[in-house]
Amino acid sequence: ICVVEVEGRKNLAPACKTVCTEGMVVRTHTPRVVNARRTVMELILSNHPNDCLTCTKNGHCELQRTAQDLGIREIKYRGETTKYQKDMSVSIVRDMDKCIMCRRCETACNEIQSVGVLSAVNRGFPAVVSTAFNDPIQTTNCINCGQCVAVCPTGALSENSNIADVLRAIADPSKTVVVQTAPAVRVGLGQDFGFSGRSVTGKMVTALRRLGFDYVFDTDFSADLTIMEEGTELLGLLNAAIG
């Protein structure tokens, strides 16, 4: 998808792997480049599920948006498609039928988080990003940080949603439903709704109460304890390294 035309080269070059040099002339939207991108996208879509309406990434999918930008309105190529069993942990759902082998999740897991759970397996058509020996992610060293989900451009990785369970609990008159929020939640809400740098605690609590929660608690105190404990641990490690 990221191919470009470099003056003086016979073949198209992948922009993500091409090193810039002084005086290089790069063309990004020539007819040849656009046609190549369309062909690559059509091949990707030929091995991709057609369940956009029910996909968790519908409306927020990079693959969907790129296909629209390229003007693709039909899938020209038909043939065998890959089939993988869905896998999930307490936090993450893996639907590898939707994996396009961009390998962003692998980079996030190995190079950013240094966990090393995800890597590319197989070659050619059956290639996919998976766990070692294709073990269920629940049995691996996954720390459920969610960074792989955050960078996934398709619905191959998504959050294991508990919204339906929460709504059922709220609707049950025999249950008292309690919600506990971390300090980061109100900060994130403030950024998402245009209140960056301002407290939205009151708005958040009001919204949760209107949803039907009986009690709303804040984890400020326990967060402070965590910071103190981790700070003490860091000082201990630094002193040990220096001493």
Residues covered by each model-derived region:
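Fe-S ferredoxin-like electron-transfer domains
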Residues: 4-144, 150, 157-158, 162-172, ...
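Iron-sulfur-associated redox domains of electron-transfer enzymes in respiratory
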Residues: 1-37, 41, 45, 159-243
